[in-house]
Amino acid sequence: MGHLTPVAAPRLACAFVPTNAQRRATAKRKLERQLERRAKQAKRRRILTIVGGSLAAVAVIVAVVVTVVVNKDDHQSTTSATPTDSASTSPPQAATAPPLPPFKPSANLGANCQYPPSPDKAVKPVKLPRTGKVPTDPAQVSVSMVTNQGNIGLMLANNESPCTVNSFVSLAQQGFFKGTTCHRLTTSPMLAVLQCGDPKGDGTGGPGYQFANEYPTDQYSANDPKLNEPVIYPRGTLAMANAGPNTNSSQFFMVYRDSKLPPQYTVFGTIQADGLTTLDKIAKAGVAGGGEDGKPATEVTITSVLLD
């Protein structure tokens, strides 16, 4: 909240008194400046937003929003589970969130995968994945990710999120992930993930393209309010980080403890038992400098990602 600045009394006999219209115009300009500043900040950060309350009430009542930064270039200015300006400092003690919805394939699943340019340029030279129709068979693709902290076996859900799997496999085969660090670990009760996939290592890098959300987002209609209500992303989930709808790129996160998120983060696989053991070890070491959100205390570097 801004501070009121004392103003010297005017020397004129009749002080200027702003009209209601002038006060409204001043307030409007102040709000526009605040929104502009926030828009610039949001452009530099990818965010995961956990929303409590109803969208319909947002215009009248401030919903409880707990924001955790995904693309974090200034950890000192944004800490774990940082509330927005008018939000509560703690998540609502609501009933347990529902599970992810059952997967129901659409008629056009994998029929037209597109990877348009993203606002940010590629950190590494990379070719676009195959576009257009991609196969959904085999249903699952086994991948071995090797890190300096141990192996993380992955099973990609090609039958549920084929465009995402197509991109991930393409990047893996081009060596995009080799030598990259997992730049973010969260350990809060609401969110327990290890985030990787950025060659810059600070949460701002990607392959120079983006693509649309798939499961579970595609199980809802576009205007369904449940898209903004938390569901459980269970332990062992492999999902994409994003900066909003349809902005998936190379960054992904691995859930090592049940976490609550709106169903707007594409799930494209699961983590094998060896991978969960590795993640548990990384999580046990905690976040560098303490806290619940930041770089892992134990550096995690991906040495290879290979199809089995």
Curated annotation (Swiss-Prot):
Residues 77-97 have a biased composition (Low complexity). The gene is ppiB. Pfam families: Pro_isomerase (PF00160). The keyword Membrane does not apply. Residues 74-123 are annotated as: Disordered. One of its GO terms (cellular component) is plasma membrane. Keywords: Isomerase, Rotamase. Its EC number is 5.2.1.8. InterPro entries: Cyclophilin-like_dom_sf (IPR029000), Cyclophilin-type_PPIase_dom (IPR002130), Cyclophilin_A-like (IPR044666). Residues 139-307 form the PPIase cyclophilin-type domain. This is Probable peptidyl-prolyl cis-trans isomerase B. It catalyses: [protein]-peptidylproline (omega=180) = [protein]-peptidylproline (omega=0). GO terms for molecular function: peptidyl-prolyl cis-trans isomerase activity.
